């Protein structure tokens, strides 16, 4: 368990908390428990117990509080990708696999503020395309155009050719993302404490294809051998980059993102709650 929290940065949800009721509740609970709260300057006048702060100040807070579902948390991780802060997701969404506590969170939130919580570290992947590097916490998906034929590509691991494929695409997933799109494509569920990357084909032409788990430290190289239309790579289902024939994706493991957890066995409890 960690030490008592000294400062939190609150990332408001302008869609699901448009009246700032939940944001004010979080700031008020922090104030009542001796914890400073900061929020972006633009919305500081809407939150009584939070001070306005710059992006750098938000990024350097001890803990970043995110209101919403898994998608909102992923967006915050992308926005603050180089932070050393821990992320706490408060679930106002649907599935809530990454978020830790529900919106009626008073007791659990006070517990966390007083230092009674754990940290789980989640591997990210860095994807380099044509000199630009992108980061994903869940997955990177190379996929065909919506109206085109299959995309063709080759896969190499650690400099060694593994296979060539014609498919609707391929998902390169972290263990955290193994319960997301990769799972829908038939990929395995991988405990997030395992440092590995999962390769799962999407509707491959070869029906004998199987997912492959690659250990941390081995570079994965995807070479696009045939792509038409708006074939693209998506990162965590949000950022999209178009690709063309001849493009090469170099994928390596990146830094770890810290998520706040109330329970040490959160992963298997969440599996039981959400999937079984």
Feature roles, as predicted:
Residues 1-63, 103-118, 128-134:
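ATP/NTP phosphate-donor binding region
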Residues 10, 66, 172:
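Redox-cofactor binding/interface segments in oxidoreductases and associated redox assembly factors
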Residues 13, 65, 69, 91, ...:
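A residue-level signal for conserved active-site and pocket-lining positions in enzyme catalytic cores
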Residues 19-20, 71-76, 179-184:
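Short glycine/serine/threonine-rich phosphate/pyrophosphate-binding segments
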Residues 67-92, 99-102:
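Glycine-rich phosphate/dinucleotide-binding loop and adjoining beta-alpha-beta core of small-molecule
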Residues 95-168:
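Catalytic core of DAGKc-family lipid kinases
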Residues 134, 142, 147, 157-161, ...:
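ATP/nucleoside-binding phosphotransfer catalytic cores, i.e., glycine-rich phosphate-binding loops
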Residues 163-167, 172-208:
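Gly/Ser/Thr-rich active-site loops/lids in small-molecule metabolic enzymes
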């Amino acid at each position: 368990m960690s030490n008592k929290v000294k400062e939190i940065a609150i990332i408001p949800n302008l869609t699901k908390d448009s009246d700032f009721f939940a944001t004010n509740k979080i700031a008020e609970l922090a104030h009542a428990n001796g914890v400073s709260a900061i929020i972006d300057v633009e919305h500081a006048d809407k939150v009584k117990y939070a001070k306005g702060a710059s992006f750098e100040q938000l990024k350097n807070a001890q803990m970043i509080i995110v209101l919403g579902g898994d998608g909102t948390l992923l967006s915050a991780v992308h926005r603050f990708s180089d932070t050393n802060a821990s992320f706490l997701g408060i679930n106002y969404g649907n599935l809530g696999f990454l978020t830790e506590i529900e919106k009626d969170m008073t007791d659990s939130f006070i517990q966390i503020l007083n230092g009674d919580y754990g940290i789980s570290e989640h591997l990210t992947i860095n994807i380099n395309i044509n000199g630009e590097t992108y980061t994903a916490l869940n997955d990177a998906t190379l996929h065909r155009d919506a109206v085109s034929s299959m995309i063709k590509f080759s896969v190499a691991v650690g400099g060694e050719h593994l296979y060539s494929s014609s498919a609707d695409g391929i998902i390169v997933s972290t263990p955290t993302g193994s319960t997301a799109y990769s799972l829908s494509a038939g990929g395995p569920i991988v405990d997030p404490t395992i440092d590995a990357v999962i390769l799962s084909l999407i509707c491959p032409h070869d029906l004998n294809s199987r997912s492959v788990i690659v250990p941390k430290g081995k570079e994965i190289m995807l070479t696009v051998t045939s792509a038409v239309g708006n074939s693209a790579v998506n990162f965590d289902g949000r950022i999209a980059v178009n690709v063309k024939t001849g493009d090469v994706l170099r994928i390596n493991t990146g830094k770890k993102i810290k998520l706040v957890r109330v329970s040490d066995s959160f992963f298997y409890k969440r599996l039981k709650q959400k999937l079984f």
